[in-house]
């Protein structure tokens, strides 16, 4: 067994000395921008999920460099916000000192894994040189009327001492609203908050999804979160009043089945009635104390009769008005038609309130009990009833979105300060001199009140300008602010130790050259948080002419989780976590990188197995040992080796193009088996093999390249060429895989059928023992592989 510790330390120092990962803005090459979702620097350091994701991008970065691309593959640290601050509080440290120390540790770990980052392009969101542009973008939003202070119902988390955006609130198993960070109770309360009008970009965000090479599930999550609905706003007159109620519906054909109107707790009419009706006021007070927000019809159908009647514009009959807790606040008009025969929520509510239930659409989707429209199919009736109500001036066609404006202020210390001063009339004014730096604050912990920690520093909060005293905004920006644009920040560091100004000619040239990001790799959990917010900011910057692409991220890959040995999500409480750093000492970075890529497809969740890592370390020894055999390098080699080498390259490159990294490793294994059989290799073939190996195991590849006397560095080698003429044959080698594990190959005539291949393997003495159990399933890829799944005993 070779000494991986000595070998890896040797090449780590040489790469550092020679700056092999230094990025150069080479305009003679096509660009390729590959991006990791940057981590927040926790004290725990890198976990296996980090290492898996970063190895994926590292392999693909090295591959594209070898293809001749000018690859930018940067890394940074998302160091502001709740995650970092909560860890700092738990550690009884100041978040500034704590995050800087952790960043140093992260860089040491990342370096040890051999990732090809150029740390001269590294950034952290807590750097005032960086966050002045976070503040600048906010200022542009403010001047465009897309950022404003509003008194709104917010999600308040007393334990965290801050407001949370809708996207940061989860529903637990009991149906209670809890914080994404820590799962603390969340309640509704009214507060003045900064909001960003992401709703102004709802249609643009929706339309932009069509041009993105993202997994369909992520697109659907964003589509559903934006929640576009095309329908009709119908006006109901209130009996004996000049007031009206407007409802939004996508199913106006059910209007003849409306037996009540339900209003949300925040509807203006409900609030007005509550002033004189103690029963309504008591109901609203009770609802405000509840944390339950999930739609569960069997439990959430409480309401109170407002003692008012509305006139159904289709039937001209009077129907009661209720305040009901199942009506979603802030969606549509805060009021819905109660059609209990055709809506589950309405049905539960009507049964509890003993309201009539009228079926107006039969099983054949035709209307009944609907006057002149009875007998029409549902779609036709929708059109004709809409037309009738529009003619009566009781309806208009409209579009609504579920997407809400982004609550952008947090009552915490560790975040970007707002570049805002309030005058004595409480009017906001933009601060032009940036950055507005975050002041030192010894007592930064939240106290449960709505006053942010920065409010305690009155010397900072109060600003004298002439005869006026201004007050700074003492809330800070959310943790998502700095990550909305960090992919631009890396580009602003090219050819500049500082950041190019975001609106400078130099920055725009770099944006034009390197955007969009060609490949973005990160977790699917950010679908309606970071990924949606970043798209919003990018589209705004596109409108401003700062960037020249409509979308920031062209292709997105969501890597699967690395599960514990017990097949469950890793967590300290379950005792199934694995620290990757000691594995470098015991097995080497190359072995861990290879194993994480070989475990399965990129998007799959995979169970950690120690035996798998041990096996990968043994395979590296096989590679090492082969290249240390005597007389293996020949001037010429036999036809089997020529064919095998070119087939290895062809299939490896095909898999790399499809990001099938586990299958590239399979091809390396197949070719190594062939080399042990033929015991011969040309120098060019050796370099070709080591070039592919270097994508996954750069340390050993570099060592073997040097051992053969070739010029360093193999990590700078170009892709070898495939001689396709060699592969034009009537014979193919088909792989046998049993329960997902490579077992060997046999040669067959091209086009051979599945049964012939299966029979040949089953009757071959070399493979017979593998078929001692009944077959559960056989997957055959013609001319390539037969994968046999055996029944477990």
UniProtKB/Swiss-Prot annotation:
Q: Give the protein's recorded name.
A: Leucine--tRNA ligase
Q: Which UniProt keywords apply?
A: Aminoacyl-tRNA synthetase, ATP-binding, Cytoplasm, Ligase, Nucleotide-binding, Protein biosynthesis
* A GO CC term assigned to this protein in UniProt: cytosol
Please report the organism this UniProt entry assigns to the protein.
Mycoplasma pneumoniae (strain ATCC 29342 / M129 / Subtype 1)
Q: Which GO terms describe its molecular function?
A: aminoacyl-tRNA deacylase activity; ATP binding; leucine-tRNA ligase activity
HAMAP family (UniProt xref): Leu_tRNA_synth_B (MF_00049_B)
Q: Which GO terms describe its biological process?
A: leucyl-tRNA aminoacylation
- Which Pfam families does the UniProt entry name for this protein? Anticodon_1 (PF08264), tRNA-synt_1 (PF00133), tRNA-synt_1_2 (PF13603), tRNA-synt_1g (PF09334)
